[in-house]
């Protein structure tokens, strides 16, 4: 169950993608409304959880100014975003966390009461006819099961592991989709202009 005080809840911001549709730009450092996408993500989750970390590939020094731990995928690098979720679960467990909130860095409009609205883990956000598999609450106790899943032959689909642990979808009926992703320059321009 999500702890309303956030003391047993941790968050991992997922920023491991290559940003290919944006020409290889680091999405975490893209500017939207005068702030980086990572600033937006930190602001979204920080009031909901006891601690925040970032899952990102490459040199962690580029994120030093944000003051949060930067997690690496380790031996599961290249197996997709679940490697970042696993790194987040391991970090959360080491810091006394029982539940992990995951949020992609390219989802700047997620609600600041996301964890409370998701309720008990495992839960995933759904809106406007889509399931947003990485906007989710994960039980940290599922880390060993996720490790076995990633040690398997694949495919390493988030939906596959979510089904394995019985993740339930929680509908967000907001008029505007709170889980719009910024994947292209057109998406960024639309977000900047308030069209999404």
Swiss-Prot record:
Binding site residues for GTP: 14-16, 27, 73, 106
Keyword Transferase annotated: yes
Binding site residues for Mg(2+): 106
Any one of the GO BP annotations: bis(molybdopterin guanine dinucleotide)molybdenum biosynthetic process
Residue stretches in coiled coil: none
Record note on domains: The N-terminal domain determines nucleotide recognition and specific binding, while the C-terminal domain determines the specific binding to the target protein.
Quaternary organization: Monomer.
Protein name (Swiss-Prot/TrEMBL): Molybdenum cofactor guanylyltransferase
Family recorded in the similarity comment: Belongs to the MobA family.
EC number(s) from the headed UniProt entry: 2.7.7.77
UniProt keyword annotations, A-Z: Cytoplasm, GTP-binding, Magnesium, Metal-binding, Molybdenum cofactor biosynthesis, Nucleotide-binding, Transferase
Database matches in InterPro entries: MobA-like_NTP_Trfase, Molybde_CF_guanTrfase, Nucleotide-diphossugar_trans
Reaction it catalyzes: Mo-molybdopterin + GTP + H(+) = Mo-molybdopterin guanine dinucleotide + diphosphate
CDD domains in the cross-refs: MobA (cd02503)
Gene Ontology MF terms in the entry: GTP binding; metal ion binding; molybdenum cofactor guanylyltransferase activity
């Amino acid at each position: 169950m999500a702890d309303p005080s956030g003391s047993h809840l941790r968050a991992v911001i997922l920023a491991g993608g290559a940003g290919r549709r944006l020409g290889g730009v680091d999405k975490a450092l893209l500017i939207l409304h005068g702030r980086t996408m990572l600033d937006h993500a930190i602001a979204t989750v920080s009031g909901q959880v006891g601690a925040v970390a970032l899952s990102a590939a490459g040199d962690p020094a580029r994120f030093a100014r944000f003051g949060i731990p930067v997690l690496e995928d380790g031996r599961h690098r290249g197996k997709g975003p679940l490697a970042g979720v696993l790194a987040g679960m391991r970090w959360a467990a080491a810091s006394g966390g029982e539940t992990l909130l995951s949020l992609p860095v390219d989802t700047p409009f997620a609600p600041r009461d996301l964890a409370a609205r998701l309720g008990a883990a495992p839960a995933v956000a759904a809106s406007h006819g889509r399931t947003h598999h990485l906007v989710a609450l994960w039980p940290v106790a599922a880390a060993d099961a996720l490790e076995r899943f990633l040690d398997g032959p694949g495919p390493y689909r988030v939906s596959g592991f979510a089904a394995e642990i019985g993740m339930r979808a929680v509908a967000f009926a907001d008029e505007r989709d709170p889980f719009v992703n910024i994947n292209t320059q057109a998406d960024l321009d639309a977000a900047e202009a308030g069209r999404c």
